């Protein structure tokens, strides 16, 4: 195999080349395409589908513009009888059951379900059923309010980008009008062939001509016919198709324009999304943030799935790409995203594990450090880089070349204007098995610089290969050159054919030509997936393993002599088999004789079962549970470390009988160690066994066969072999490896009892899920159905069975202490109320045993500990990122020894913390984030409220220095309230600064809220929740999205072009969905009113008759034929442009100044995401400014501050009575429902309240009124605004808004009086003047 070229990379791990027969059978399929009409391509303006649809289709007339996987058969799997069931029968009047193995937790042979006479109705509804667990793993649906907010934000963004397109048309229209003014007439439109670069000029000119002759083009059909008469080429073919189909758009001019826009317009939203995609990189962000931003661009772009996968891989971090390309290629973008997130978690876990000693590191992460040759290089080049050796125009494109009908390869394609043809490197073609053809005669290479592709003659060429760039696809033939520095070179012929628009500076290439619109913008032919067309030879066997059917059919294997490994993807695996056979072979006997010789009887030590049972009874001593004070490293959850990140499981059940011959396995926990590869058996060879349909195989032989897989992606014990993987594609490869190994060693599996491609699996009494592990239903049913023990032997059997599963039960030692005390031989057996209560509590604890989540060392840990008179207990807790709630990772408990009872009270409180550090040192030692120890108020006060080391004994101080920990108070409601995170104020401020600097500059890339959130986003939400505990995080998130809306740009971009009625309609539509944020609504309304467009004359001193504003003139332009022919058109147009106001805001008060005015220089930044809290004092000042009287408003309420001053009451236009004026004002405020927070306090008490106000300077009423009266102009001066006219508009607007408030948006609190706004009665002539 040749080394890959330096500038090429595969989007994923390269799939094996199919056999020649498969290639021949599928020949010609690559040319199969699905014909679709040009108008049916992917919508370019996906973002413009929100608000535009609600407001109706907008005409672009300039006159109006100014206005689950397959698996085998499934059946319930029941565990075989065990010793516990046998002992139960002995205690129940001699009832008999079959005797099983000594380990009840290990699933053995599949037998039919037997009725359990002790099983209760609760046990039948046990929550650990597999079907129920799969439902629990389904993602939560997002909140309806969040979905509504995001939909509204997307609608606003759509409208914003649509207005950019209209502004471009307006710019073109202005240029055409100015040229027409100079020449005296409008030019005739040129023939439009379909080039998108000429579309705006063509369609605008046509509309101007149609508007100039309204009598000639009096109906829609004539207008459409005029435009069609000026079409040619591809555009004429598109219009001809509409005429042939008799489409309804022919008689509807606005619909025809919209259809034409969809086909020929290169919209601003698509342009911005493409620029964002090419510049998108993960950088130092979390993968979830990068993926969210990436996914927000996908609907707008509409690129093929494989192109999106290549761009997603290109922007990832180098360390993620390094391990991503070791895994087989995912078949979809969704699977790739899932795999990227899993690899990021694996890498974070690896960084945490590397802080441990080498001997303490788990084996399952060794694959991350295994040397694997690089297959591709993405980080060495970027699309906008240039080659230093090329002195002419050139650029690089991310091009996907479908080297065969089965998969594509992403390469760095050089677009060179000096190359005459399209070239491909010979080494690249050989590496990817590209089919080559010989030319009848050699051709010379003609390039401006022969050093790039060489000067040797060209003899070979390729068949047409599908090439993809963005949503542009074509079939290209390449000439093969021997010494090219680049994998693919696109020359001048390619440039002339497509005529792309090239930005040589940015390295961008976009396609607008009619040829591309007709032939290239269509969905590419899909890759041929051989597994989708395969037919399984056995019913129930997935078709991916149809060639390995002999592993499940021993009779077919006996008839055939095929011992060859699979030929479709497992050749590399089979090459390692002879070396294993050589290691397994005997020195005095050849390989063939050793393996082909059949044994007449299985090899098994005599009396192994008796010795094993004797060792088991000797090993477990109940006295140690009461007196031992040693805290050993806990097996669970360390046992399941290798399952972290596994989401796909396949359980294979071996045929025959598997016997255990080891003398060192005494307990159930010893079985777990062997099954999960924690204790690998050192075997150099094994004795042959009888090759038949149901053989008897020693357990050590199975482990020897799978010795290089156990602990990495396989666990095995008895007849069960569990294969697990991170991704679906990797899982196929792993299962195939195991089946090929079994076929080579003549080990057969039962197809009926095997389960393929599941998300949960049962193994050794456990239910394994992607999240964690929980107890099997049969284990729980056995314990909960156990009858009341009548003898010490019966109680001992129960405790021996339940003891290995103590890690799944909280406070196991505390619950079972009375039962263990009865097992002591020096005391008579007694069963009283205390023992019965402990027995019932043990059943209850197993029935409620939770799912133990996989601990993640990269995340923060929480310790919850406790101690009683007889035992201590601890719980290892983490936070679930998806739900935000606490999850348990492990439990530990033991009895307190007699020596520890004499310890001091302080040492007794620290004792469970020390024990937890001992048993979970693998996870808690050298953590990056501090371990938070949850204590109640009493313990927190006694432990100095800061550090435990103050009260530690001398011999414990050195031990505790190995751990980074801190203490905090235990939350009151442990089930509902999430655990708090302890952060410093400086860290929160730093996070806010980072969030402000890293805010996306484009709203089109804002991510939608998902169930999975990045750690950074969670930290920010939690810190905000700590600052504002009374507000939910969801509302802060929604307001955060609204805060990112560029109100200034929206107003200055398109609101300035509308009339007053249109502005009112747009604003009402926009704010109707934002009513439940009344504070934000008030500020937005104020901003709109302050940005009044007209400059009015300064009013004189207060007089009875105020100045009347001049009538607003219409800015519409009507071009009639008579006007065009006259000589006064220039004068008319000049006057029109002179009277037109500027297109930018003139009287604009910055939002920062306004927020600083009412909130002070600092708090407005802090409250940016909370929403502005407008107090009654603010509303009363507005009433005073606009001359409005306040009265009660139904359905609303105010929240007075304890230090709030009395709001002023407006008596007239200029006279204000403040708080210090008269005592009768206080009574009047009570009647009106406006409270000032002082109530009936005395004047001295009120003065004290004024003294308690913040020391920072707050604006006085006079400053506020002066600031509102004069607003800033463009020239830097101050312009007075017309109070009466502005007040009238504000009153109408607020009244219409508040009357449409929904009852459900009102806060759920007892109704009481609020405040409303009411217009003072005025004279009829004043009203008429204001109208």
From Swiss-Prot:
Spell out the protein name for this chain.
Retrotransposon-like protein 1
Indicate, by first and last residue, each region the UniProt record lists as having compositional bias (Acidic residues).
109-123, 128-143, 569-578, 1015-1024, 1320-1331
Query: From start to end residue, where is composition biased (Low complexity)?
Result: 19-30, 992-1001
The source's domain of life comes to Eukaryota
What this chain does, per the entry, is described as: Plays an essential role in capillaries endothelial cells for the maintenance of feto-maternal interface and for development of the placenta.
Membrane protein topology class: Multi-pass membrane protein
Name the gene.
RTL1
Q: What is the lineage of its organism?
A: Eukaryota, Metazoa, Chordata, Craniata, Vertebrata
What's one GO-annotated cellular component?
membrane
Annotated organism of origin: Bos taurus (Bovine)
């Amino acid at each position: 195999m040749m080394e890959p070229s330096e500038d090429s990379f595969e989007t994923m791990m390269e799939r094996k080349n199919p056999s020649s027969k498969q290639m021949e059978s599928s020949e010609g399929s690559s040319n199969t395409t699905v014909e679709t009409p040009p108008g049916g391509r992917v919508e370019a303006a996906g973002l413009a589908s929100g608000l535009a649809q609600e407001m109706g289709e907008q005409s672009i007339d300039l006159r109006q513009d100014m206005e689950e996987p397959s698996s085998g058969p499934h059946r319930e799997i029941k565990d075989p009888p065990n010793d516990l069931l046998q002992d139960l029968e002995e205690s129940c009047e001699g009832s008999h059951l079959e005797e099983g193995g000594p380990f009840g937790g290990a699933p053995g042979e599949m037998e039919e379900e037997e009725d359990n006479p002790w099983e209760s109705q609760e046990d039948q509804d046990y929550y650990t059923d597999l079907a129920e667990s799969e439902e629990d793993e389904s993602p939560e649906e997002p909140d309806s309010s969040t979905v509504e907010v995001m939909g509204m934000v997307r609608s606003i963004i759509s409208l914003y980008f649509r207005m950019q397109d209209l502004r471009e048309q307006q710019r073109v229209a202005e240029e055409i009008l100015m040229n027409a003014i100079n020449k005296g007439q409008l030019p005739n439109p040129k023939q439009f062939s379909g080039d998108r670069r000429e579309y705006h000029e063509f369609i605008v000119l046509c509309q101007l001509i149609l508007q100039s002759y309204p009598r000639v083009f009096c109906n829609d059909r004539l207008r459409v016919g005029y435009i069609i008469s000026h079409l040619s080429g591809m555009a004429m073919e598109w219009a001809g198709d509409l005429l042939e189909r008799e489409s309804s758009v022919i008689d509807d001019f606005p619909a025809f324009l919209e259809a034409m826009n969809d086909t020929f317009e290169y919209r601003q939203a698509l342009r911005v999304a493409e620029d964002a995609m090419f510049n998108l990189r993960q950088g130092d962000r979390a993968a979830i943030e990068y993926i969210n931003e990436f996914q927000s661009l996908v609907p707008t772009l509409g690129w093929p799935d494989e192109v999106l996968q290549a761009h997603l891989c290109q922007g990832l971090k180098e360390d993620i790409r390094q391990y991503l390309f070791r895994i087989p290629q995912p078949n979809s973008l969704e699977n790739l995203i899932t795999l990227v997130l899993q690899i990021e978690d694996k890498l974070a876990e690896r960084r945490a594990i590397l802080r441990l000693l080498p001997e303490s590191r788990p084996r399952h992460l060794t694959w991350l450090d295994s040397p694997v040759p690089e297959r591709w290089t993405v980080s060495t080049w970027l699309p906008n880089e240039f080659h230093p050796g090329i002195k002419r125009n050139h650029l690089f494109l991310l091009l996907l070349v479908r080297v065969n009908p089965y998969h594509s390869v992403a390469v760095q394609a050089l677009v060179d204007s000096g190359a005459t043809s399209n070239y491909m490197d010979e080494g690249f073609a050989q590496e990817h098995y590209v089919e080559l053809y010989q030319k009848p005669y050699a051709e010379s290479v003609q390039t401006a610089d022969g050093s790039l592709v060489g000067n040797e003659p060209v003899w070979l060429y390729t068949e047409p290969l599908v090439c993809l760039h963005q949503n542009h696809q074509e079939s290209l033939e390449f000439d093969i050159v021997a010494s090219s520095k680049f994998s693919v070179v696109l020359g001048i012929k390619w440039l002339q054919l497509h005529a792309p628009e090239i930005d040589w500076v940015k390295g961008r290439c976009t396609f607008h030509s009619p040829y591309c619109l007709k032939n290239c913008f269509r969905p590419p032919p899909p890759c041929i997936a051989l597994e989708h067309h395969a037919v399984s030879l056995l019913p129930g066997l997935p078709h991916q393993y149809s060639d390995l059917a002999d592993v499940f059919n021993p009779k077919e294997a006996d008839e055939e002599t095929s011992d060859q490994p699979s030929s479709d993807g497992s050749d590399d695996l089979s090459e390692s088999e002879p070396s294993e056979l050589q290691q397994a072979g005997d020195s005095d006997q050849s390989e063939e004789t050793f393996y082909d010789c059949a044994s007449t009887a299985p090899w098994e030590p005599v009396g192994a079962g008796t010795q094993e049972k004797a060792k088991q009874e000797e090993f477990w001593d109940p006295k140690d549970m009461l007196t031992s004070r040693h805290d050993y490293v806990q097996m669970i959850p360390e046992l399941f470390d290798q399952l972290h990140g596994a989401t796909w499981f396949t359980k294979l059940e071996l045929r025959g009988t598997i016997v255990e011959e080891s003398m060192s396995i005494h307990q159930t926990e010893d079985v777990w160690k062997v099954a999960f590869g924690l204790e690998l058996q050192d075997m150099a060879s094994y004795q042959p066994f009888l090759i038949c349909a149901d053989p008897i195989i020693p357990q050590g032989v199975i482990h020897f066969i799978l010795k290089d897989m156990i602990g990495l992606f396989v666990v095995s014990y008895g007849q069960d072999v569990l294969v697990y993987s991170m991704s679906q594609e990797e899982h196929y490869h792993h299962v195939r490896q195991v089946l090929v190994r079994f076929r080579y060693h003549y080990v057969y599996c039962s197809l009926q009892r095997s389960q393929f491609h599941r998300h949960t699996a049962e193994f050794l009494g456990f239910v394994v899920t992607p999240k964690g592990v929980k107890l099997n239903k049969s284990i729980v049913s056995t314990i909960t159905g156990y009858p009341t023990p009548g003898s010490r032997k019966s109680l001992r059997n129960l405790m021996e069975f339940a003891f290995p599963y103590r890690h799944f039960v909280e406070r196991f030692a505390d619950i079972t202490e009375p039962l263990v005390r009865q097992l002591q031989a020096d005391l008579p057996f007694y069963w009283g109320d205390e023992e019965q209560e402990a027995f019932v509590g043990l059943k209850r604890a197993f029935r409620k045993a939770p799912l133990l989540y996989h601990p993640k060392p990269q995340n923060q840990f929480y310790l919850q500990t406790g101690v009683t008179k007889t035992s201590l207990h601890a719980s290892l807790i983490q936070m679930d990122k998806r739900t935000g709630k606490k999850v348990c990772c492990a439990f530990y408990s033991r009895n307190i020894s007699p020596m520890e009872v004499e310890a001091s009270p302080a040492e007794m409180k620290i004792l469970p913390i020390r024990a937890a550090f001992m048993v979970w040192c693998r996870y808690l030692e050298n953590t990056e984030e501090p371990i938070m120890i949850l204590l109640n108020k009493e313990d927190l006060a006694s432990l100095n409220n800061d550090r435990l080391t103050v009260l530690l004994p001398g011999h414990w101080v050195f031990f505790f220095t190995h751990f980074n920990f801190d203490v905090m108070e235990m939350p009151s409601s442990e089930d509902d309230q999430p655990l708090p995170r302890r952060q410093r104020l400086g860290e929160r401020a730093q996070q806010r600064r980072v969030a402000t600097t890293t805010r996306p500059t484009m709203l089109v890339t804002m991510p939608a809220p998902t169930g999975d959130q990045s750690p950074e986003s969670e930290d920010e939400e939690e810190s905000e929740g700590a600052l504002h505990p009374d507000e939910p995080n969801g509302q802060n998130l929604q307001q955060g999205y609204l805060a990112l809306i560029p109100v200034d740009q929206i107003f200055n971009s398109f609101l300035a072009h509308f009339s007053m009625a249109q502005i009112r309609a747009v604003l009402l539509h926009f704010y109707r969905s934002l009513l439940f944020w009344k504070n934000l609504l008030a500020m937005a309304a104020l901003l709109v009113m302050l940005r009044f467009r007209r400059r009015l004359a300064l009013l004189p001193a207060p007089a009875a008759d105020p100045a009347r504003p001049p009538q607003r003139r219409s800015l519409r332009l009507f071009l009639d034929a008579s006007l065009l022919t006259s000589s006064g058109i220039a004068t008319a147009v000049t006057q029109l442009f002179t009277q037109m106001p500027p297109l930018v805001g003139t009287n604009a008060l910055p939002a920062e100044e306004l927020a600083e005015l009412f909130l002070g220089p600092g708090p407005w930044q802090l409250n940016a995401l909370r929403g502005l809290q407008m107090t009654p004092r603010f509303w009363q000042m507005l009433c005073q400014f606009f001359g409005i009287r306040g009265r009660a408003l139904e359905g609303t309420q105010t929240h007075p501050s304890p230090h709030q001053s009395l709001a002023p009451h407006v008596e007239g236009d200029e006279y204000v009575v403040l708080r210090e004026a008269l005592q009768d004002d206080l009574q009047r405020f009570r009647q009106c429902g406006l409270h000032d927070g002082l109530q009936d306090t005395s004047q001295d008490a009120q003065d004290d309240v004024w003294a308690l106000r913040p020391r920072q300077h707050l604006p006085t009423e006079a400053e506020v009124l002066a600031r509102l009266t004069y607003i800033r102009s463009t020239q830097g001066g101050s312009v007075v605004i017309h109070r009466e006219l502005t007040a009238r508009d504000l009153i109408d607007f607020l009244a219409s808004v508040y009357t449409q408030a929904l009852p459900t948006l009102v806060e759920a609190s007892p109704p009481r009086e609020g405040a409303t706004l009411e217009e003072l009665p005025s004279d009829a002539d004043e009203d008429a003047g204001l109208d």
